[in-house]
C-alpha cells in the first residue's frame, strides 16, 4: 500500500467552506438555545400546576442539558420533557415479563407495589394501578404506564386552561388542542417567538441504581478520565415501553456523555452539528422526508470518539467530520448502528427507513461535500472530482461478516480512501496498511 494520501490543492481550497458552514450554524446556536429555554419555561409553568393538582407528578428543574443539545441541532425532532413520579423506586418490585426478553438490549419490566411496605398508597388508586390476584403473596398490583399517561394528559389539559386563564403563560404559546396521547408519551407544541418546538412529555421513574449491563462499557476510552464511570454509576430511569410495561432509558446518560465530549479539545461537537444540518437540509430535504435523527448521529459521534483517540483526529474540522462519516457509512452499509451503551441493540432495525437511499445520499456527500456546504453565492465554483471510486460499499460491509473489523485500523483505511487520514503515528499507519492488505481485493485498488 502506498503512503497515506495527502490533501490535494483543490481540497485545500475547499477547506474554508467547512468553516463558513460551521460559522453559519454557530450564529444560530444562541437564538435557538434562547427559544428553547423560553418554550421550556412555558412547559415548566404548566407542570408546576400539574404538580399542584396532583403531587404524584414532580417538576424536575435539575437537568439543564436539553437546551445545550437543542442548540447543537438544526433538525426539529421532538424534545423530551420528563415528568418524574413521586415514588420510591427502590421500594417497588421490578418484575420481568413472562414473555422472552427481546434481543435488542431493552430491559422490560412491570412495576409492582409490594404488599408489605409503606409510602406507596398513593400509587394503589384505580386511576394508575391494576390489582393483582389475591393469590399473589408478594405483589399487591402494578403501576400501569397507559393509566399514568391518561392521568397526566387530563392534568395537562386542566393545567393549561388554568395557566391561560390566570395569564401565567403568554397568549398563543400553548394550546391544549395540540396535546396528543401517543402510546409511550404525550406530544405537545409550544410556541417560542417565531419557532414552534415539539415536546414529548414522558412520565419517568427515577432510580438510584445503575444497570449492571452498563458495567462493561465503563472502561471505554475517549472521554475525560473518570467521567464515563461517574456518569454510568448514576441511576438508569424507567419510562413507558407499552401499555403495560416499562423499560430502562439511557437517554439522559447519553446526553451527559455528549456534554463530556464538549469539554475536550477539538471539533467533536462541531462535526455533529455540521452533519445534523446536512442531514436536515440535504438528506431529509429540509425535514420533509423521513431519515436519520439527531439521536442516530449522536450515537455515531460517541462511537467515533472511542475509535479515534488521538488529538490529531479532531484537530482539523474537515477531518473530524469524516471521522463521523466513515462510521455512519459503515453502519448504513451493514444496516446496523449499535447502541453505545447496549451494543447488542441495533438502532436501525425496525426503523422503517429506506437505508439504501440514505446510504446513497451520505456516500454522495462524503465523496463530493462541496455542493451541500455552499451557503452563499460567493461559495459557488467548480467542485473537485469525487474522492472515491468503486468498491467502497463492499469494504464498508466487512464488519457485518467479521466484527473484528470494528476497530480503529479498519476505519483508518476508510479515512485514507477519503484522503483525510492525516495521522503521523507510525504504529497506527502500520496497522492501517496491514488491514488494507487484507481488504484490497474487496475494497478495490484505489487508495
Curated annotation (Swiss-Prot):
InterPro entries in UniProt: Mab-21_HhH/H2TH-like (IPR046906), MAB21L/cGLR (IPR024810)
Pfam families, sorted: Mab-21_C
Protein name: Protein mab-21-like 4
